[in-house]
C-alpha cells in the first residue's frame, strides 16, 4: 500500500487511507489523510485501491453500499468517475455488486488481479468493457521476485545465526 501511495503522490494525487489496526494514524505521515472509518474513506475518494488481508471482517467488505458513497468529482472539481483497484485478495470486493454497479454506469472502472474463485474468474465480470483484469500476476515482476529472493535470504540467514 505504501508503494502505491508513493506513486499516487508522485502523480499529484492526494492520498487517503483507512487502517483499523494503526492506532495513531496521524503521526505516521503528514502526506496522507487518515480516516476513522471505511465509510468516511469511501465518501471522500473517487479512486480506491484495496490493500488488506482476507479475514472474516474483510470478506465482501467492498460492496455496493460502500461504493455508492464515492464521489465522482475530484477535490478540485474535475469530473473523473469512480474507480476501484483490488490487488489484495479475492472475496474482499463483492464481485456481483461490482458487476451491477459497472452495468448501471455508477462505477466507472474496476481493476482486478484477484478473484473470489481462482483460478476461474467471473466470466461476465472479467469480460466487461470497464474491467481491467490480470491472472493474479502482480508479483511476477523482476523487482518483486528480487525482493522475494532478498527476503528468503534474510530469513534463512536469521535462522542459522
Q: What are the residue ranges of the model-derived segments?
A:
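Rossmann-like dinucleotide/phosphate-binding beta-alpha-beta segment
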Residues: 1-72
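Rossmann-like dinucleotide-binding domain for NAD(H)/NADP(H)
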Residues: 68, 72-161
Amino acid at each position: 500500500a505504501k508503494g502505491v501511495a508513493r506513486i499516487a503522490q508522485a502523480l499529484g494525487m492526494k492520498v487517503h487511507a483507512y487502517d483499523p489496526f494503526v492506532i495513531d494514524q496521524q503521526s505516521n505521515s503528514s502526506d496522507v489523510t487518515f480516516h476513522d472509518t471505511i465509510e468516511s474513506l469511501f465518501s471522500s475518494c473517487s479512486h480506491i485501491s484495496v490493500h488488506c488481508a482476507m479475514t472474516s471482517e474483510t470478506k465482501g467488505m467492498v460492496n455496493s453500499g460502500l461504493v455508492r458513497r464515492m464521489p465522482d468529482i475530484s477535490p478540485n472539481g474535475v469530473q473523473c468517475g469512480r474507480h476501484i483497484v483490488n490487488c489484495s485478495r479475492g472475496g474482499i470486493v463483492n464481485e456481483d455488486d461490482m458487476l451491477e454497479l459497472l452495468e448501471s454506469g455508477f462505477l466507472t472502472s474496476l481493476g482486478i488481479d484477484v478473484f473470489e474463485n481462482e483460478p476461474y474468474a467471473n466470466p461476465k465480470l472479467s469480460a466487461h468493457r470497464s474491467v481491467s483484469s490480470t491472472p493474479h500476476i502482480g508479483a511476477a515482476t523482476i523487482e518483486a521476485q528480487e525482493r522475494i529472493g532478498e527476503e528468503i535470504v534474510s530469513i534463512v540467514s536469521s535462522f542459522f545465526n
